[in-house]
Structure formats: C-alpha cells, structure tokens
Curated annotation (Swiss-Prot):
SUPFAM superfamilies: Radical SAM enzymes
Cofactor: [4Fe-4S] cluster
Cystines in this chain: none
Protein name: Lipoyl synthase, chloroplastic
Enzyme class: transferase
Organs and tissues of expression: Expressed in roots, leaves and flowers.
Protein residues bound to [4Fe-4S] cluster 1: 127, 132, 138, 373
Annotated compartments: Plastid, Chloroplast
Cofactor detail note: Binds 2 [4Fe-4S] clusters per subunit. One cluster is coordinated with 3 cysteines and an exchangeable S-adenosyl-L-methionine.
Keyword Lipid metabolism applies: no
Originating organism: Arabidopsis thaliana (Mouse-ear cress)
Phylogenetic classification of the source organism: Eukaryota, Viridiplantae, Streptophyta, Embryophyta, Tracheophyta
Amino acid sequence: MMHHCSITKPTFSISISTQKLHHHSSKFLNLGFRIRCESGDVSSPLRTKAVSLSSEMEDSSSLKKSLMELEGKKSEPYPGGMPKMGPFTGRDPNVKKPAWLRQKAPQGERFQEVKESLSRLNLNTVCEEAQCPNIGECWNGGGDGVATATIMVLGDTCTRGCRFCAVKTSRNPPPPDPMEPENTAKAIASWGVDYIVITSVDRDDIPDGGSGHFAQTVKAMKRHKPDIMIECLTSDFRGDLEAVDTLVHSGLDVFAHNVETVKRLQRLVRDPRAGYEQSMSVLKHAKISKPGMITKTSIMLGLGETDEELKEAMADLRAIDVDILTLGQYLQPTPLHLTVKEYVTPEKFDFWKTYGESIGFRYVASGPLVRSSYRAGELFVKTMVKESYSKSLS
C-alpha cells in the first residue's frame, strides 16, 4: 500500500508594511511584519502574529524568534496547502524528487528547428503547454533520429481546470483557427515522421466539443501524407458519443482518451465536468463505433492511489477492451497544483508493466517519465495498427 508522510511543520507567509520618514528619504522608519501560519487541517484556526522591527536592527533574530514561537505552538500534522487553493496543493518537503526524474534542459540544433517550425506555422504542442519532461528527447529525435512533437489543436486554452494540468484555462477561449488543420498537416508532412500524436484542449464552449475541427485535422494530414499513422488523444466531449463517432471515422489509427487517475481520486484530480464513468463510456464507444479500433489510455501515479485501486482501474479498462495503457509519475507543474504524494520507483513501474500485460493489455508503457503521448512502444503500436488494418481487409 502506498504511504504518504504528512508535513510536521507549519509554513508561514509574511507581508511587509513600510512607513517612510518623509518623501525625500529612502530610509524606512519601521517594518511591520504580519506572519500567517496555515494548518492543512481545515478545522484548525489560522494563527496570525504581528512583529515590529526597528530600522536600526541589523539582523532578523527577533523575526526568527517569533517564527520559532509560532512553530512551537503547532503540533498537529501539516499535509500541505496553498492559501485559497485547498489542503492538497503546495510542495511537500518530505517528498523529495529522486535522481531518476532529473532531466537535462532541452537543447540542440534539431530541437531548435522543430521549435521554429511550430512557431512559424502558429502551432501549439502539449510538449510545451503541459511542460512535458520528454520534450528534449522527442524534439531532438530520440533513439531513431526522427524528431517529432505532439500537436495540440483547438487552440492553447482549455475550458476546464484539472488540478494536475499546466495548460492555461478560460471559460471563453478564442475560437479555433480555421487554418489550423491545414497548417498542422503541412508541418507534420515536412518533418518526415510516420507516426504522430494529436491532442487537444477541452472545448466545452463548442457544440460538438471540437470533434469536427479535430477530424478535419486528421483528414488534412492523411491527404498530405496518406501513409502516416495518427494517434488522437482526445477529450471526453462531455460524453457526447456522436462527437466520438465523428473522430473515430476521420481516418485516425489509434483512439486515446485518458482516465488520468483511479476512481476514488477523480473528483480531486479532474475538473468536475470530467468523470471516471464518462471516460470509460468514451473509450468503450470508440471500440463499438469502429470494431478493431485500437484504444489507449493513461493513468498518473503518485497522487495517493493504492495498489488495489490501480488494479481495479486496470480491470475496468480491460473489461471494455482497451488495448494500450501508459503509466507515468505525476509531476507537480507549480505549487498551485496538486501535491505529489509519492515518487513511485522504477522497479514498481516495472511491476505494473508486467501485471498489466498479464491481465490482457496488448502493450503497457510504464515508467517514471512515460506520458500518454510518449514515444515508448511506438514501434509496437505501429505493428498493431498494421495488423489491425490487415484484418479489416481480410
């Protein structure tokens, strides 16, 4: 069972008020500090203490003493929390990022070429918007030397506010660029890749959730490069199964939609408009709408899920015949996002890969830096697509 140690120390936010001697002077008469100590326990009252320091003081010993006094008054656990963001945000100092998650800053000639190509064609990528840790590897070409990126269509602004995601949000984002499908197709064709992942923000402000625009992008790519394999990582379209049909029959090769986390944590992790059953319905319908369609999903680990809960989610996914599962470590984009509860070891990820394939998934990509649009297993997926296509012709 996964375990999380709560923080045992309070944290403090300090606001400073100043009073000048007169408008010609740059010296301050005094500094007024208000120290806010917040407990992660919602039943515990906030404590505030004021401290005044004279302008002549040369050190912060009085302030340190006051902080120590406040700290001494707190004995209950502090599990994390940012003001106004709830008790599940903030950095947990007891959960340190391990060495296996440290990545070099992305750089290189090929990386810059991809970046400039995307900028020139006004295209968005989930690589940048979601702060993907694998951006350097993918844009530089990885092991096969072929650079690729995961294109994000329907703009760069999401109508939802999932608590794990770094993509910017708005209730009324700008309308989709009508030239985006064609520009995307041109960019991908120029890269020379034979497998591409397209994803999108959620667009609850559009009647079909953006499925029509998404489908146009797929069709444009197939026109420019008929032999390219396209994986679409989609939203849930608010559970609109007709929207799912539109995309499934657009010419894509892999239909992907992420359940993100186990059933118990859905409401904590995802926007209220998303949900476990709704995501399962979308994945199930993609298979029904087009028999033989390869389906894929992803789950983040390290959010506080238990082994039994993860096994239950994996069983539910196999019950609707999902083919591919990716498992990766949740990484907190900013202190305002959900706190990492645990850094799962590479050995445990190996265990989940073996377990997933033992219960019937055709492929499981499992590792700390694996993401739903990651290249891991790309060759295997290509083989699956070709096999599925051959069966449909026979």
